[in-house]
């Protein structure tokens, strides 16, 4: 993938999955700070003011200061403000009967009267919004779009469009022919205060670039560059833009008969919900999609496409994290598309059945700057019709429109097509995206590519706002003859043209009128499929064929099951599969695909393995010992059971050396046990399938405590005992053995000692806990001998327990530390058939040995204001009153919990608490930001605090993000190649561009002296004029000498830069012209990025000094579309070295611009010899071979002649 481009845009991957990198506003919160309200368009050329809109009647008369909707969308709590009563106001209502609204707003000195109508086609009837919780609970509410409006500006109905939301203030886009405005409230949640003094809004303004702003002005006439020259430069820079705009005007579409409706499922992950807040996120999403809908209504698209919301799902945090894989856009898109497919309603007539899924997230699913990811031409496909979009404010509407454009079949402009000239002017499908609120359009290539595929997207044909359509025949032409279709196309009397028999009637439908049967007409389209074209034949896809059943719309059906394949394991219960295909018949011509799973499985080889200690999961981890390195080292990998039950069919392994748990990024083999706590449920293709102890899939039958399937514990025996020894030697001390088959094993030290417990496998002799040279006193959970063990060391008292069953006998040992006596207690359950007859520690009834005892009180349900807490019970051994595992009290009835009140003190008011500002993200440049934590906390009575929801804090939220270190980075001078010499003979000048650039090729600040940009070039002497012997050639040189008789006017000026006056100033290819004074003034900001105060030297000031030390270099202009006319400074004498002999032709000439003087200067031919200097004013009849100097002389002559008149 190519790296991101510069500030102008981001490169997009040209692969089949297209990703979008788009520079958008840094923030787009609905609750914006007054200092820097985010969300609107920002950057070069953007202006903003504060305005207070008011609601009016149709004639613009004041009705109320309340601009917010009377009701808010479902799920959003806002207090309704009654409209203000205006004394003496009559005539006009708040809204007309059609639901229209009218607002007046004054922006940048212009009074705009907005005429709005409800956008009733953005939210489909029956649409819902779902809030998914962490526990799996879902809250469903109807989705209402009552506060979404579109319309125009009074007086500009044909050239303006408005898309606004008034859920909470006015937010949206006002677009006119010459300029665009983006409006949003300065602060959110103040609807209740609107009636008092109105609501303050921020209005952003940007002029369109279709007409360049006027240049020059009064100061332009004072410079050495004429106003005409500046205007020609402006026109030259606007040629390309005007051409595209004119082509857009030629492409204005006519309203199509068929509307296309994209019914959208909008998925929103938790990062978006948390950023905008649960109170504001729904109306923000509706406003965003309202703008997307308006983008698809732009006339440059050439089709009428409606974006219709049928369902919004706001995901929980856990689900959001599982869908987005950080830094992996391909996998993230696959997860999102799979999720959207699972949300699809099976019935196509369901109100929530969607055609396309749009997923919004603020997580970084790809490299820095990636904004979107989508398949190409996937519309209406059950899995591929989806897009993944990075939400970053209202400008994200262009991300959504761009990615959905890919799904509709549009490619990048300029890549494989001829629309690269529209990229810089805001085409939505540009690879370097320039689209913004102030300018956007669909290129001619996007229009052509859309028309190529749009007719094939049948799912967009249905209208969610109309119902009870009669069922259409599979082939509509079966009911309409060619004569009837001609009448529909051209009017009464028209019939199929029969004058010519040489054409195929199914290729194009030709029609004629009986009054003129030889004049045939066509709309260049074929007849409807199914139209009869010959006896027994019908038109289908442009061909006249026999109509057989296999070409009609056909739903798919499952074929027969294949035989079961081989078993995944040779012993220990494996899985074998069989599959089926949706080919009985295949779905065809828009028919439905098969529903249900394409595979089935059953258990196999359930006999025990010869190696009773074999652990299938352990074997899979061990296979990676030689192949998988972690931390640049090899490890011995042990099995690990994940805490999350959903992850237990994925392979996780634990390093024996470091204890780190690592995901192997793969699923466990089919037939692996889901959990060590369940001996029967198995993993099948990454999912845990419930299996009962009877070996039946889905069975709920379980073993009793000693392993009898469906048993009642009647065959279970409890074995327990205490064993004590005194350490008399170094090394291990054997205590006792626990037999195979033991379950619910508990081994515990009777007293606190410094000894260490150790366990080894009797059959293999391998230690499973605390090998002598590798004692680990830390509490842990580990897998060994096919079961899960829990080891605890609490203040020197060790405990080891497992649910079992043990697959082999273990030996319990102790590593002594000191002389203290060793005492261990043990207890386990075992089936009576496995019990050793010599074991005297068998207890017939152990239920009386344990009891439920009060362990602690639960935490109070509220930190203040009166809460509740309940008793929590634990299992206690009666013998020594020690708390043990609760499983030992399973046979004892648990007492009911006791409730009591707690924390009766009153609650204090929550306040905002801010953290320290983090270091700036950049040391220099234009993107430095620093953030800090902002929390709403509530003080508690015990001098602690707790975090609460932000809605409980009444004050304005403090700023949590601000710009920093916004200054240019240090750079280095970079010089280009020297230009060609300005003359073809004699002495001229050469120039080269010299720019200050940083390492990332942006503008910087250079402390070193700037390298020279101009130098003298000396070519061979110019040929003499030999046609007239009386005339000799002389060389005239301009010098910057002060003439006391002709005082030099002060022409240098300094002015504060007001910003670039053309969007082309940011093109790097034009930066080399910054040395031209006129261009420097036009593009003062781009040419002088390190300094807001731009020196504008429209004409070089004559330096003062002695005549022999002063010389002025005239710049060489190489701009092909720009002619700079510079008048020579008045009163500057000319130096005339005379070329009277050929011997001096090769001598060194110090002049910078040489002109031939084709006439004789009296008295000088014999008296003056080169290189004498003769002060002299240039004659108006001088002629030069240097075309640039000749143009300057001609301009001077014209001005002198005009002065005489």
UniProtKB/Swiss-Prot annotation:
The record describes how the cofactor is bound as:
Binds 1 zinc ion per subunit.
The catalysed reaction is: Cleaves the N-propeptide of collagen chain alpha1(I) at Pro-|-Gln and of alpha1(II) and alpha2(I) at Ala-|-Gln
The alphabetical list of record keywords is: Cleavage on pair of basic residues, Collagen degradation, Disulfide bond, Extracellular matrix, Glycoprotein, Hydrolase, Metal-binding, Metalloprotease, Protease, Repeat, Secreted, Signal, Zinc, Zymogen
Q: Which Pfam families match?
A: ADAMTS_CR_2 (PF17771), ADAMTS_CR_3 (PF19236), ADAMTS_spacer1 (PF05986), Pep_M12B_propep (PF01562), Reprolysin (PF01421), TSP1_ADAMTS (PF19030), TSP_1 (PF00090)
Ranges for domain Peptidase M12B: 260-464
Please report, in chain numbering, the residue ranges of the motif Cell attachment site.
Answer: 685-687
Q: Gene3D superfamilies from the entry? A: 2.60.120.830, 3.40.1620.60, Collagenase (Catalytic Domain), Thrombospondin type-1 (TSP1) repeat
Principal subcellular localization: secreted
EC class of this enzyme? hydrolase
Q: Which residues constitute the signal peptide according to the record?
A: 1-28
Q: Does the keyword Repeat apply?
A: yes
UniProt-annotated binding residues for Zn(2+)? 402, 406, 412
Tell me where it resides. Secreted, Extracellular space, Extracellular matrix
Instruction: Give the GO biological process terms.
Output: collagen biosynthetic process; collagen catabolic process; collagen fibril organization; extracellular matrix organization; protein processing; proteolysis; supramolecular fiber organization
SUPFAM superfamilies found in the cross-reference section: Metalloproteases ('zincins'), catalytic domain (SSF55486), TSP-1 type 1 repeat (SSF82895)
Gene Ontology cellular component terms for the protein in this record: extracellular matrix; extracellular region
* Gene Ontology terms, MF aspect: metalloendopeptidase activity; zinc ion binding
Modifications after synthesis and translation: The N-terminus is blocked. The precursor is cleaved by a furin endopeptidase.
**Disulfide-bond pairs as recorded:** 337-386, 380-459, 419-445, 486-511, 497-520, 506-539, 533-544, 567-604, 571-609, 582-594, 981-1017, 985-1022, 996-1006
User: Disintegrin domain spans which residues?
Assistant: 474-554
Q: Which disease is it linked to?
A: Defects in ADAMTS2 are the cause of dermatosparaxis, a recessively inherited disorder characterized by severe skin fragility and biochemically by the presence in skin of procollagen incompletely processed at the N-terminus.
Matching entries from PANTHER family are given as: A DISINTEGRIN AND METALLOPROTEINASE WITH THROMBOSPONDIN MOTIFS 2, ADAMTS A DISINTEGRIN AND METALLOPROTEASE WITH THROMBOSPONDIN MOTIFS PROTEASE
Q: How does it assemble?
A: May belong to a multimeric complex. Binds specifically to collagen type XIV.
Q: What protein name is recorded for this chain? A: A disintegrin and metalloproteinase with thrombospondin motifs 2
Annotated source species: Bos taurus
């Amino acid at each position: 993938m190519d790296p991101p481009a510069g500030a102008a845009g981001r490169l997009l991957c040209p692969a089949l999955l297209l990703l979008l990198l788009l520079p958008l506003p840094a923030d787009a919160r609905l609750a914006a700070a007054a200092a820097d309200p985010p969300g609107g368009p920002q950057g070069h050329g953007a202006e903003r003011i504060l305005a207070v809109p008011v609601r009016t009647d149709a004639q613009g008369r004041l009705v109320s200061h309340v601009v917010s909707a009377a009701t808010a969308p479902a799920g959003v709590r806002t207090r309704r403000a009654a409209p203000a009563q205006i004394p003496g106001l009559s005539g006009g209502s708040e809204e007309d009967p059609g639901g229209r609204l009218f607002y007046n707003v004054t922006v940048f000195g212009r009074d705009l009267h907005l005429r709005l109508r409800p956008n009733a086609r953005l939210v489909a009837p029956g649409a819902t919004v779902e809030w998914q919780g962490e526990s799996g609970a879902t809250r469903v509410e109807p989705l209402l779009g009552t506060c979404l409006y579109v319309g125009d500006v009074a007086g500009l109905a044909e050239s303006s469009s408005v898309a606004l939301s008034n859920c909470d203030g006015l937010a949206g886009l006002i677009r006119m022919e010459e300029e665009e405005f983006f409006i949003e409230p300065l602060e959110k949640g103040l609807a209740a205060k609107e009636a008092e003094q109105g609501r303050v809004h921020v209005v952003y303004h940007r002029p369109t670039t279709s007409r360049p702003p006027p240049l020059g002005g009064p100061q332009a006439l004072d410079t050495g560059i004429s106003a005409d020259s500046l205007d020609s430069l402006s026109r030259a820079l606007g040629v390309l833009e005007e051409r595209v705009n004119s082509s857009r005007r030629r492409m204005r579409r006519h309203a199509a008969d068929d509307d296309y409706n994209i019914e959208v499922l909008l998925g929103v992950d938790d990062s978006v919900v948390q950023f905008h807040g649960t109170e504001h996120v729904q109306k923000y999403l509706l406003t965003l999609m309202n703008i997307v809908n308006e983008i698809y209504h732009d006339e440059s698209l050439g089709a009428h496409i409606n974006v219709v919301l049928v369902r919004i799902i706001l995901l929980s945090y856990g689900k959001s994290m599982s869908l987005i894989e950080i830094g992996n856009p391909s996998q993230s898109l696959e997860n999102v598309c799979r999720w959207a497919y699972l949300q699809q309603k099976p019935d196509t007539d369901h109100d929530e059945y969607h055609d396309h899924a749009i997923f919004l997230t603020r997580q970084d699913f790809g490299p820095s700057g990636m904004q979107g990811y989508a398949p190409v031409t996937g519309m209406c496909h059950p899995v591929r019709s989806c897009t993944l979009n990075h939400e970053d404010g209202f400008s994200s509407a262009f991300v959504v429109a761009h990615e959905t454009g890919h799904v509709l079949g549009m490619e990048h402009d300029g890549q494989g097509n001829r629309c690269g000239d529209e990229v810089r002017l805001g085409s939505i499908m540009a690879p370097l995206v320039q689209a913004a609120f102030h300018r956007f359009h669909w290129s001619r290539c996007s229009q052509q590519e859309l028309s190529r595929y749009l007719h094939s997207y049948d799912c967009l044909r249905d209208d969610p706002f109309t119902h009870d359509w009669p069922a259409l025949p599979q082939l509509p032409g079966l009911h309409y003859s060619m004569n009837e279709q001609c009448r529909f196309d051209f009017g009464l009397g028209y019939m199929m043209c029969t004058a010519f028999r040489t054409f195929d009637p199914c290729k194009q439908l030709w029609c004629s009128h009986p009054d003129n049967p030889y004049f045939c007409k066509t709309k260049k389209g074929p007849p409807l499929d199914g139209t009869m074209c010959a006896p027994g034949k019908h038109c289908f896809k442009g061909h006249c064929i026999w109509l057989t059943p296999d070409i009609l719309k056909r739903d798919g059906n499952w074929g027969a099951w294949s035989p079961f394949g081989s078993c995944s394991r040779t012993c220990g219960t494996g899985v074998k599969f069989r599959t089926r295909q949706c080919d009985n018949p295949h779905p065809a011509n828009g028919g439905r695909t098969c529903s249900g799973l394409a595979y089935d499985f059953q258990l196999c080889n359930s006999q025990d393995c010869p190696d009773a200690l074999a652990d299938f999961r352990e074997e899979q981890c061990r296979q990676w010992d030689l192949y998988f390195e972690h931390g640049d080292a090899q490890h011995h990998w042990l099995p690990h059971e994940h805490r999350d039950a959903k992850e237990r069919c994925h392979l996780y392994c634990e390093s024996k050396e470091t204890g780190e748990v690592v995901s192997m990024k793969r699923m466990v083999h089919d037939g692996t046990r889901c959990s060590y706590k369940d001996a029967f449920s198995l993993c099948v293709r990454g999912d845990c399938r419930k299996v009962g102890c009877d070996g039946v899939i889905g069975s709920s039958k379980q073993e009793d405590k000693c392993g009898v399937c469906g048993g009642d514990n009647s065959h279970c025996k409890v074995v327990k005992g205490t064993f004590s020894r005194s350490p008399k030697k170094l090394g291990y001390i054997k205590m006792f053995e626990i037999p195979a088959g033991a379950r619910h094993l508990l081994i515990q030290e009777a007293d606190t000692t410094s000894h260490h417990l150790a366990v080894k496998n009797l059959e293999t002799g391998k230690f499973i806990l605390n090998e002598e040279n590798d004692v680990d006193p830390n509490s842990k959970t580990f897998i060994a001998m096919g079961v899960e063990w829990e080891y605890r060391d609490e203040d020197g008292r060790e405990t080891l327990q497992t649910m079992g069953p043990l697959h082999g006998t273990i030996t319990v040992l102790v590593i002594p530390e000191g002389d203290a006596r060793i005492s261990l207690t043990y207890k386990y359950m075992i089936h009576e058939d496995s019990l050793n007859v010599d074991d005297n520690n068998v207890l017939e009834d152990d239920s009386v040995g344990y009891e439920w005892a009060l362990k602690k009180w639960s935490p109070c349900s509220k930190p203040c204001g009166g809460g509740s807490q309940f008793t929590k019970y634990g299992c206690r051994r009666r013998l020594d009153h020690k708390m043990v595992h609760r499983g030992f009290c399973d046979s004892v009835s648990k007492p009911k919990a006791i409730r009591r009140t707690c924390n009766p003190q009153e609650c204090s008011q929550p306040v905002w608490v801010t953290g320290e500002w983090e270091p700036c993200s950049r040391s220099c440049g234009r993107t430095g930001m620093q953030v800090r934590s902002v929390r709403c906390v509530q003080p508690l009575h015990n001098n602690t605090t707790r975090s609460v929801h932000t809605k409980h804090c009444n004050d304005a939220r403090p700023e949590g993000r601000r710009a920093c270190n916004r200054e240019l980075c240090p750079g280095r001078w970079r010089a280009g190649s020297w230009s060609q010499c300005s003359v073809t003979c004699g002495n001229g000048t050469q120039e080269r561009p010299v720019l200050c650039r940083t390492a990332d090729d942006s503008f910087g600040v250079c402390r070193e002296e700037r390298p020279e940009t101009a130098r003298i070039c000396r070519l061979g002497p110019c040929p003499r004029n030999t046609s007239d012997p009386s005339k000799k050639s002389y060389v005239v040189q301009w010098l910057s000498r002060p003439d006391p008789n002709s005082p030099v006017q002060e022409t240098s000026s300094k002015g504060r830069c007001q910003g670039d006056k053309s969007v082309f100033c940011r093109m790097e290819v034009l930066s080399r012209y910054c040395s031209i004074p006129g261009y420097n003034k036009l593009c003062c900001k781009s040419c002088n990025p390190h300094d807001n105060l731009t020196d504008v030297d429209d004409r070089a000031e004559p330096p003062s000094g002695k005549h022999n030390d002063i010389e002025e270099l005239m710049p060489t202009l190489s701009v092909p579309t720009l002619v700079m006319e510079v008048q020579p400074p008045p009163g500057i004498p000319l130096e005339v070295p005379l070329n009277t002999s050929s011997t001096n032709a090769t001598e060194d000439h110090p002049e910078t611009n040489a002109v031939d003087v084709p006439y004789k200067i009296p008295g000088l031919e014999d008296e003056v010899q080169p290189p004498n200097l003769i002060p002299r004013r240039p004659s108006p009849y001088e002629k030069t071979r240097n075309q640039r100097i000749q143009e300057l002389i001609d301009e001077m002559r014209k001005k002198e002649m005009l002065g005489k008149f």
